[in-house]
């Protein structure tokens, strides 16, 4: 699960085992070693691509090293796999001198520094990073005060319902492909609130009173119960600052409210990593078909790992220009309609996969180690695959329409956006994609 191509894990653990950060990094090294046995790999760590241009069937890359060296590379094809461009989170900048502001990227929640303290911890961020951090603190330091500032709240896919363990893999749970298919049938471009409620109530788990966010994160029911029982306080707001005034220390929130906290409290920045950096727009494939770009500004599938896998196959099959994939400017849409974002992305994924499945050899899908349906024994993924292939023509016949300028969804008016482009080569004059059967 979650690997490169069809390269298997070597941990020797049960399939339900959750790999640690170090084990994931070791697996990446293993994947590179396996790839080196198949093709020639030249490593240029410390180098960065500055620019590229195409001329006479050649792609010319200009690269620079960390020490200022220049290198020009000529190739027939170029794959720019920058992905989500995730960078570590810095600690939140706060005015107070009486708190300890840290980031889980630079401060181990189970490390000596945190262990030597017994002051309260404020976890800022209600997404998956916040949940994992809160869970680590609650289980590592029983009885310690741990608080959560959860923003507008988040719901998660229930690991127990999507990836049941043991014998339930044969008869329990629901395959992810089936959920995406149902999501694609339900979402019409205007009913994101209804779809969110259906998805949350049927396959989700959550601990906050409101759940305004969903980003495909997984959480088990036991993890959720442990966190909910171990939290001292949950505040549905956003931290703006921590200030010292009148002899006290206050957390200041976006709403204008404040909360007096104990001096020496820890503030842990868990505000997330995804779709935060404003990368410049770039189409997923160049006009010549020689350059493929894997990043969220022209997303064709829900995860950049899937994009890298399938777009690379289309590139080397010389079909990357022939298959009319839709692209989605994911960061742009998320800024303009966070509520509609995950369901638009899910519908887009099913539509594009329905086009890809008709354009590549079956082996491409059979060798895809990213396929989450592989969690289940062979008979179950096979039956879902048959349903998907049978339903592919229905997804392929979805059409684009204009969302009326006065339309409101989820109680909020929505401005025009260029977030979705059809076929990439001829962007439609309509501002928003509306899926219609």
Where are these regions (language model features)?
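Glycine-rich active-site loop/strand segments that organize a redox cofactor
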Residues: 1-30, 149-212
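Feature captures the FAD/FMN-dependent oxidoreductase FAD-binding
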Residues: 10-88, 206-209, 216, 223-252, ...
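C-terminal, flexible cofactor-proximal segment of oxidoreductases
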Residues: 96-98, 308-437
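Rossmann-like dinucleotide/flavin-binding elements
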Residues: 109-156, 302-358
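C-terminal catalytic lobe of FAD-dependent flavoproteins
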Residues: 200-277, 374-434
């Amino acid at each position: 699960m979650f690997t490169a191509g069809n390269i298997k894990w070597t941990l020797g653990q049960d399939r339900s085992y959750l790999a640690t950060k170090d084990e994931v990094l070791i697996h990446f090294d293993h994947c590179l070693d396996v790839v080196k046995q198949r093709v020639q790999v030249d490593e240029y760590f410390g180098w960065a691509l500055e620019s590229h241009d195409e001329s006479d069937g050649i792609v010319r890359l200009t690269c620079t090293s960390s020490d200022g060296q220049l290198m020009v590379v000529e190739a027939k094809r170029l794959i720019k796999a920058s992905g989500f461009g995730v960078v570590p989170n810095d600690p939140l900048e706060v005015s107070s001198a009486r708190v300890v502001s840290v980031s889980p990227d630079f401060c181990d929640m189970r490390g000596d520094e945190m262990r030597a303290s017994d002051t309260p911890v404020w976890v800022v961020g209600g997404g998956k990073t916040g949940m994992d951090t809160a869970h680590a603190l609650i289980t590592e330091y029983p009885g310690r005060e741990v608080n959560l500032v959860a923003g507008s709240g988040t719901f998660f896919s229930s690991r127990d319902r999507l990836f049941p363990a043991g014998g339930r893999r044969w008869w329990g749970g629901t395959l992810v492909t089936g959920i995406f298919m149902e999501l694609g049938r339900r979402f019409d471009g205007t009913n994101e609130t209804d779809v969110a409620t259906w998805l949350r109530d049927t396959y989700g788990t959550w601990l906050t009173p409101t759940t305004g966010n969903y980003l495909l994160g997984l959480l088990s029911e036991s993890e959720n119960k442990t966190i909910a029982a171990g939290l001292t306080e949950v505040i549905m707001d956003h931290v703006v600052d921590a200030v010292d005034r009148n002899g006290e220390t206050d957390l200041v929130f976006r709403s204008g409210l404040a909360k007096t906290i104990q001096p020496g409290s820890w503030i842990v920045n868990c505000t997330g990593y995804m779709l935060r950096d404003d990368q410049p727009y770039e189409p997923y494939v160049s006009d010549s078909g020689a350059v493929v770009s894997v990043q969220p500004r022209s997303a064709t599938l829900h995860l950049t790992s899937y994009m890298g896998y399938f777009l690379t196959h289309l590139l080397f099959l010389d079909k990357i220009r022939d298959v009319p994939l839709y692209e989605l400017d994911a960061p742009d849409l998320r800024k303009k309609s966070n509520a509609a974002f995950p369901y638009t992305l899910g519908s887009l994924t099913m539509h594009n996969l329905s086009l890809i499945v008709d354009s590549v050899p079956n082996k491409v899908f059979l060798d895809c180690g990213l396929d989450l349906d592989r969690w289940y024994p062979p008979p179950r993924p096979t039956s879902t695959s048959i349903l998907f292939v049978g339903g592919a023509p229905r997804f392929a016949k979805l059409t684009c329409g204009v969302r009326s300028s006065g339309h409101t969804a989820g109680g909020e008016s929505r401005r025009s956006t260029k977030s979705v482009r059809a076929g990439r080569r001829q962007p439609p004059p309509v501002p928003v994609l509306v899926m219609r059967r």
